[in-house]
């Protein structure tokens, strides 16, 4: 038998902790969706800037961008 029940065992509810009390208000908004686009445009700008950053790093790595005064072996 995979599960076993113990007769007369008392199981208390979830324990309250300081961290749990601190994080409880953050979880109270679970499942609620704000109407409209929200912060989607901001996320799009962040993704575009990150893509530009990655392309600059790739161009430097491939030496396709000339850097004056920096010698690369």
From Swiss-Prot:
GO terms for biological process: photosynthesis; protein stabilization. The chain crosses the membrane at residues 41-61. InterPro entries: PSII_PsbH, PSII_PsbH_sf. GO terms for molecular function: phosphate ion binding. Keywords: Chloroplast, Membrane, Phosphoprotein, Photosynthesis, Photosystem II, Plastid, Thylakoid, Transmembrane, Transmembrane helix. One of the components of the core complex of photosystem II (PSII), required for its stability and/or assembly. PSII is a light-driven water:plastoquinone oxidoreductase that uses light energy to abstract electrons from H(2)O, generating O(2) and a proton gradient subsequently used for ATP formation. It consists of a core antenna complex that captures photons, and an electron transfer chain that converts photonic excitation into a charge separation. NCBIfam families: PRK02624.1. PANTHER family: PHOTOSYSTEM II REACTION CENTER PROTEIN H. This is Photosystem II reaction center protein H. It comes from Gossypium hirsutum (Upland cotton).
